[in-house]
Amino acid sequence: MLWFKNILVYRLNKEIALSMDELEQQLASLAFTPCSSQDMTKTGWVSPMGDRGEALIHVAGKQVMMCARKEDKILPATVIKQALQDKVEKLEGEQGRKLKKTEKATLKDEVVHTLLPRAFSKFSQTFIWLDLDKQLVIVDSGSAKRAEDNLALLRKTLGSLPVVPLNFNESVESKMTQWVRSGELPAGFTLMDEAELKAVLEEGGVIRCKKQELVSDEIATHIEAGKFVTKLSLDWEDRLQFMLCDDGSIKRIKFSDTLREQNDDIDKADFAQRFDADFVLMTGELSALIERVIEVLGGEAE
């Protein structure tokens, strides 16, 4: 199973009123199909278990996993430009005149259609986890745009998806700055050795620290000068490490070896059973972490 590396968390404002069978059917209506010769991009649902599964959702209790696949045809701008230039020069030579802007635009479309069947494909996939117990949608992505694109696919699939990014009562950057300044963290959390500090004003600069003692005079000087901590590496309960960001996203998640080895007693040949056990383990850990992060940031804003 692919363990999540980055998560963006969204609040469901209305329960998804579908049974799991109905959800499976809805996803099947937008199952992934490869690009045809004239498609630039295609997106759809595939099994979270990849080629080893057929179901488009994986369910464990009230936790549901889905996977969106995207295919993009790669046509470098330089290739299009050169092919267009060759065609324009040929036509202008034959007709003895300069082509109009609209004519060049039409030619460009023709060039793209001609090149598309020979273009390479780039594939990507994004996992989406529905926590129907806590009414959260968690996207395995560090990019807000990519997350929103995949939520748009889910919204199209379901007909409606009223979600908003998780918001907190306290400022994330103010809280992280307080932790670094004081060296005192909430129970269960430990400072690691990486952070990013930014000044409120853009011209104030950015400081990125790696392998750095964060509770130090050097870092304190930057904070006193008006910089805020915008990214902070943390350890939680010796079970996982991550980077907390000022937008509330949790990135570069690394589960401890001890945690990941908990299901090693399951025969690796039994892919489905191991996938399910790892899914239960991962969602349980991340669900507890999300709940704790909400708590230490003053609760969820209404």
Curated annotation (Swiss-Prot):
Cellular-component GO terms for this entry: bacterial nucleoid; cytoplasm
InterPro entries named among the record's database cross-references: RdgC
Main subcellular location: cytoplasm
Keywords attached to this entry: Cytoplasm, DNA recombination
GO molecular function: double-stranded DNA binding
Superkingdom as given in the UniProt entry: Bacteria
Disulphide-bonded residues: none
Signal peptide per UniProt: none
Keyword presence, Cytoplasm: yes
Biological process terms in GO annotation: DNA recombination; regulation of DNA recombination
Compartments reported by the entry: Cytoplasm, Nucleoid
Function in brief: May be involved in recombination.
Family according to the record: Belongs to the RdgC family.
Protein name per its UniProtKB record: Recombination-associated protein RdgC
Species of the source: Proteus mirabilis (strain HI4320)
Highest classification ranks of the organism: Bacteria, Pseudomonadati, Pseudomonadota, Gammaproteobacteria, Enterobacterales
Name of the encoding gene: rdgC
